[in-house]
Amino acid sequence: MINKSITENNKKRPIIGRLICRNNQKQIPLASESKNEMEKGTILIVDDNKGVLASLELLLETEFSEIKTAHHPNQIISIINTSPIDVIILDMNFSAGINNGNEGLYWLKRIREIAPALPVVMLTAYGDVELAVKALKNDATDFLLKPWDNRT
């Protein structure tokens, strides 16, 4: 149940307002061309840290008409199947002491199985160039590091 504007509209604009996607081939608009008819989409933020969820909700509340959050990735599939989601921000690490990003990559693969066109932005505090490349090669739309800069 993905919002049709994702797959049918081919105009190129940033996905998340201030969180600009660098992969131009996957920039999918969430708003109509007319500023008077702005249609904001729905974002799903998945992170085990409640502080990160709250911070991203505050940061993105003016960019999206609806913000859904999940504190565990096992909620993703159910949410995607029952709600129209336009973009996902997905943490890469959920288990204590593990910071290799494999959990996030696993869930990215699961998302791609049921929603191949859904933009997924990977989020991690343990990022490096190698992990970013790995995420993008696994079809992530973009890669963000924690902490992020709200001004950009």
Enumerate the predicted regions with their spans.
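C-terminal output helix
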Residues: 129-130, 144-152
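Acidic, metal-coordinating helix/loop segments flanking the phosphotransfer/catalytic sites
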Residues: 68-87
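Glycine-rich ATP-binding loops of the HATPase_c
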Residues: 2-10
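Two-component/phosphorelay signaling modules centered on CheY-like receiver
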Residues: 50-69
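Short amphipathic alpha-helix used as the core "switch/output" element in two-component signaling
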Residues: 97-116, 134
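Non-catalytic signal-transmission and effector/linker regions of two-component phosphorelay proteins
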Residues: 18, 23-44, 57, 72-74
